[in-house]
Amino acid sequence: MSIYFFEKINAAGIRTHFVSADLGDTTMEVLPAKVFGHGLEVICRHKAVGSFIRRYGEYIEEGADLPSYVETTFKNDEKGDPLVTKDALVALGVMTEAQYDDIKDMTQKITKIVADDLKEKGLVLYDIKFEYGYDPEGRVMLIDEIASGNMRVYQDGQYIDPMTLSKLFFA
């Protein structure tokens, strides 16, 4: 799934670390990239579910539409992947304002690519998680993977687990 989406995203002119892959050798060639801070996760939400509803459930109904809502968290399992704002990321020296703006823009564009592709298969993307890094010039790029385990997808109102999603996607 990662290779499929990285190729689509690259074709759309969005920077990623993906260069090529050989499924036979199970290898992937990628550009060098540094992670932001000690690792950052960027989530784009189309529906109010998961940790979003746990945090804000008194203000919004579960499953309510969200307009490509983007949020960032530090990768830190011990602290429950705490939310972090743009201002905090800049103040802490994790990234520049321009890098944050690039990440948000790229996240919304990539999410649309993935959501549109899933929609063609009768599937609805509720949310998806990405990781970003930057090259030696400081340019933001999508890194890591785009896998079924990084997205929450539904079909006919029912959640599709990652293994089933992979099978449905390539059916």
Where do the PLM segments sit?
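Short polybasic/polar patches that bind polyanions
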Residues: N10, V90, K119
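ATP-dependent carboxylate/phosphate-activation module, predominantly the ATP-grasp catalytic core
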Residues: R55-D102
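A long amphipathic alpha-helix within ATP-dependent nucleotide-binding catalytic cores
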Residues: M95-Y126
